[in-house]
Regions:
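Hydrophobic positions on the alpha1 helix immediately C-terminal to the Walker A/P-loop
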Residues: 33, 37
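Interdomain hinge/linker elements that couple catalytic modules in large macromolecular machines
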Residues: 132-179
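Short regulatory helix/loop adjacent to the ATP-binding pocket of P-loop NTPases
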Residues: 112-127, 143
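Conserved catalytic/switch belt of AAA+ P-loop NTPases
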Residues: 89-112, 119-121
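Conserved lysine of the Walker
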Residues: 30
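Pre-Walker A adenine-sensing motif
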Residues: 1-14
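Short glycine-rich substrate-engagement loop in P-loop NTPases that contacts/grips substrate
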Residues: 46-76
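Hydrophobic anchor at the beta1->P-loop junction of P-loop NTPases
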Residues: 22
């Protein structure tokens, strides 16, 4: 796996009494980053997917009692694609304010959508990060500076999205499929 520069920054912010929000374009590696962070902590985690209708229904009318029952003994609560959940800001606020031993990590593809749903309820209760596609520095640390310099023109043509970078030789096909 390619180590993301944000990983260490986010790990240092965990369990500080605030939610961690990660936004960024689709397919830039948000879910993979969160999986790596959670794995690094070794702590019990509840993973919820905002795309899932059951998850949306489960969080529709949140109360601190229901959330405590849902979270159980988990100490990390991940909400992937959080912007898809109605009143997600209230859900996160209830956890941050009432279940202080639980770290909330939420991801969203659309920073505008997610920001509109969480900013007011989470004022002062969140650390926000924006994840971009892979960077030159991340790739240089992964393969080597010399190799990454050699590949720079290729990267400028096809980009630094993780799927393109990790599927060398299939870039044209991936770009065609993405349209």
């Amino acid at each position: 796996m390619i180590l993301r520069l944000l990983q260490g920054v986010i790990i240092k912010r965990l369990f500080k009494g605030k939610a961690v929000l990660i936004t960024g374009p689709r397919q830039c590696g948000k879910t993979t980053l969160v999986k790596s962070i959670v794995e690094n902590t070794g702590k019990q985690t509840l993973w919820l997917n905002g795309d899932d209708a059951d998850t949306q229904s489960l969080l529709q009318s949140p109360t601190s009692t229901r959330l405590k029952a849902l979270i159980g003994k988990n100490v990390i609560m991940v909400i992937d694609e959080a912007q898809r959940i109605e009143n997600i800001g209230i859900v996160i606020k209830l956890v941050v304010d009432n279940i202080k031993t639980v770290q909330v990590i939420a991801t969203g593809s659309s920073s505008f959508e997610l920001a509109n749903k969480i900013n007011e309820p989470l004022t002062g209760r969140k650390f926000e990060y924006h994840l971009f596609p892979l960077s030159f520095n991340e790739m240089a640390a992964h393969i080597s500076v010399l190799e990454e310099k050699r590949l720079l023109e290729h990267r400028m043509i096809y980009g630094y999205y993780p799927e393109v970078v990790t599927n060398a030789g299939d870039e044209e096909n991936l770009l065609r499929l993405g349209n």
